[in-house]
Amino acid sequence: MLRTNNPALREDVFRKPETWDSFQAAQRGGAVAVGPAARPGVMTLQGAVNASFILLGLCAATAIAGWMFIQNNTAMVLPVTFGGAIAGMVLALIISFRPRTAPFLAPVYAIGEGAFVAGISMVYATYAQGTNLGGATGTGIIFQAALLTFGILGALLLAYTTRLIKPSENFKLGVAAATGGIFFVFIAQLVLNLVFGITIPYIWSSGPIGIAFAGFVVVIAALNLVLDFDFIEQGAENELPRHMEWYAAFGLLVTLVWLYVSIL
């Protein structure tokens, strides 16, 4: 995926790569010592940021519209939730194996995820209203989860850009391994539930083990944001093809939705 050209044969070998530091300086209007402009057709940090805002906007707008639709059509909560989830999974698989489709399919994926977010949010809100938490808490937990998600995003982005967090190879390996382990647990739970009608004990309960596992999932989901930031920066430095801007934005949206649902 990364360029493998011999750097000694490249005319722009000494061009300063685009990084978060230079990007922030440019946003503040400061002078940045850079060489020739990025060649057309390659990934840039600004392009990835723009694509991320577009996908996030589409997802948020669809989620809000979906929430309003479900409120007036409560019987549609499950069709909207499962429809968005299935569409999202199918599109995610296509984009993952065919990154060149990202500029076209990532916006559609964002819309599908927005529908899923609306549906799953309504499910959690309805559950909260039926408990001793009280009816007003139903919509309150949705707002709090969204606020926490964007708060974590902002905090980790600040920590990354100021280099308080430096994703070393061991860090990346550890986060990837933990993510794979969580994915395996989710798949195992799905199979056990569908085939035998049972659940994995303790980790899905409201007891200490269940709460600890839920907290662990939130932490790993949040740390995946750091890997997304690193991928965007490394992609710009290595001048990946332009369509990787949308692929990187797609990956960031996947992590954000996972983080939001985990917080719920």
What do these predicted ranges mean?
Residues M1-L264:
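A hydrophobic alpha-helical transmembrane-helix feature that marks the membrane cores
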